[in-house]
Amino acid sequence: MPRQTPIERYRNIGISAHIDAGKTTTTERILFYTGVNHKIGEVHDGAATMDWMEQEQERGITITSAATHCMWRGMGGNYPEHRINIIDTPGHVDFTIEVERSMRVLDGACMVYDSVGGVQPQSETVWRQANKYKVPRIAFVNKMDRVGADFFRVERQMRERLKGNPVPVQIPVGAEDHFRGVVDLVKMKAIVWDDASQGVKFEYIDIPEELRATAQEWHDKMVEAAAEADEALLEKYLGGEALTEAEIKGALRRRTIAGEIVPMLCGSAFKNKGVQAMLDAVVDYLPSPIDIPSIQGHGEKDEPLERHANDDEPFSALAFKIMTDPFVGQLIFFRVYSGSVYSGDTVYNPVKEKKERLGRILQMHANQRVEIKDVHAGDIAAAVGLKEATTGDTLCDPDNVIILERMEFPEPVISQAVEPKTKGDQEKMGLALNRLAQEDPSFRVKTDEESGQTIISGMGELHLEILVDRMKREFGVEATVGKPQVAYRETIRKVADDVEGKFIKQSGGRGQYGHAVITLQPNPGKGYEFVDEIKGGVIPREFIPAVDKGIRDTLNAGVLAGYPVVDVKVRLTFGSYHDVDSNENAFRMAGSMAFKDAMRRADPILLEPMMAVEVETPEEYMGNVIGDLSSRRGMVQGTEDIPGGGGKVVHAEVPLAEMFGYSTNLRSLSQGRATYTMEFKHYAEAPRTVSETVISAKRA
């Protein structure tokens, strides 16, 4: 089926905000006014369409970015029909990965702010992510009906905290209980919404007397911002000529898409005021897929390639999310950047080097689905039947291969052991964890070789809590989780010369005889090394690998606390054998005994993992952050300004053992405004007090 809406009338947008700024309610109202939802779902009732996982409805926070779409002809029905694809994004810091991956496939974003709370910590994180992917944005100041609502304070905070350049295109008429509508600064008219029709009906009226001076002041600021779009407009403006409505909107649009300004609007989604005008602003100011730079990638020989948002180009798309659906199995959400694809077509995944047949194509309206036959450049849809694709993979035309830039996902920072409450659930738990890890690239699962336990790792304590919860709800597996754990290692500081291991059993019948002499020495950063220095055949050739094997067996459990041994060099220097009683097993035992003894003599020490920690914090909390890192045995390595203003970055090296509970602590230290990332750096010697505690705990 040919494209129904021309691509210049597409808008792919994300609605992004801090928790409780009213983002989900705003999306619900959009779906209502665009005629999709006839009864508005309120988050208070746990009935919102976009929040479709059970935990989201219980907790009232959005965890997975559901993708949905709607059609819009303008508030007054005066626009040609536009197609708006909306990705709802979470606002909690442990789900930053979800925001990051949706930013990657958006063309524009609508930032929702609470008129009372204003620019919150999470808003700063989301803003940085939008900057990273150069996403043009508009701002919607929501909850104007709340006590303490202040539109102009949010405008100041956007300048000061986010270093943004907000340009109000509306100002509120009244606030708190008296919030009635907005002044449209382009038309210089007030808009008031009718309560009885849930805001569907509205009218333009003259600006109330008491607001005229304020409206004129902000209108002039807006026109000045528009005039800076190009020389011709600036000359016209400076020459005292009035700019037309079309010129103002066109100029603001160009500057928004260039990332120079952020048009600001206001309203109350809950009270059904202002959402339709915000939709008009999405059409007026945010880009269509052809207004943004073409997507970059590279070919199979690493040559740079690009694809334009055009149906005639070869098909290319990015898989940005995987979800498991109870009815159809795995859904892969993808964004089409160029070309078209039909259900039943074969697509190529250059990352996995596999061809796959595209089964059904579904378009989602929250969690209801409509099956469609084809998708085109600019579309967002979900595919059924792709077995190999994972988040961040490219899908493309098999004859025109392109690999789009991959998404980067942070390494998990916290691990916990998890075991099923009943033994019978072991297999089910394995399946559930693998399915969850496929959906969420920031969640990892592995089996600990030392303890045999299943270890899960993720981005924070809430992240793991929600995944364990999902395992219970979606897969029916009840699990218990252990305390967060640290992976220590053991090594040595000194050389132990000529240490012998003798394994002799000679009491009737076939005996055992193995005798090996080794020298053990530190081998920093090089792992385990075995050197054969046997001369004159004192140990026969065929038994030497057995000595090495015996030592390797012992490496897994050190002498201090049973942790793996790293960075040691063993030289096999001497030994003896018996013609009849010597065999592989005897030399394996001799090697193991010699190594254990040598370890004890070589001054063994405990190593702990050190993490590179980066904290982004507003300047006023920097002292607290540095003091706290020092109290965690951290070494601060330097600080720098965040580019574009907005605080400082502190670089430090901190032992992993001291970082548990850090996200909660950091939130309270900085009133939730600082964020951090950490990744493994290297192993370092643990201080004596730490070693003693770990060893005695292990021996107990």
UniProtKB/Swiss-Prot annotation:
The keyword Protein biosynthesis applies. It comes from Ralstonia nicotianae (strain ATCC BAA-1114 / GMI1000) (Ralstonia solanacearum). SUPFAM superfamilies: EF-G C-terminal domain-like, P-loop containing nucleoside triphosphate hydrolases, Ribosomal protein S5 domain 2-like, Translation proteins. InterPro entries: EFG_II, EFG_III, EFG_III/V, EFG_IV, EFG_V, EFG_V-like, EFTu-like_2, G_TR_CS. This is Elongation factor G 2. GTP binds at residues 17-24, 88-92, 142-145. It is found in: Cytoplasm. PROSITE patterns: G_TR_1, G_TR_2. One of its GO terms (cellular component) is cytoplasm. Residues 8-290 form the tr-type G domain. Catalyzes the GTP-dependent ribosomal translocation step during translation elongation. During this step, the ribosome changes from the pre-translocational (PRE) to the post-translocational (POST) state as the newly formed A-site-bound peptidyl-tRNA and P-site-bound deacylated tRNA move to the P and E sites, respectively. Catalyzes the coordinated movement of the two tRNA molecules, the mRNA and conformational changes in the ribosome. The keyword Nucleotidyltransferase does not apply. Disulfide bonds: none annotated. Gene3D superfamilies: 3.30.230.10, 3.30.70.240, Elongation Factor G (Translational Gtpase), domain 3, P-loop containing nucleotide triphosphate hydrolases, Translation factors. Belongs to the TRAFAC class translation factor GTPase superfamily. Classic translation factor GTPase family. EF-G/EF-2 subfamily. One of its GO terms (biological process) is ribosome disassembly.
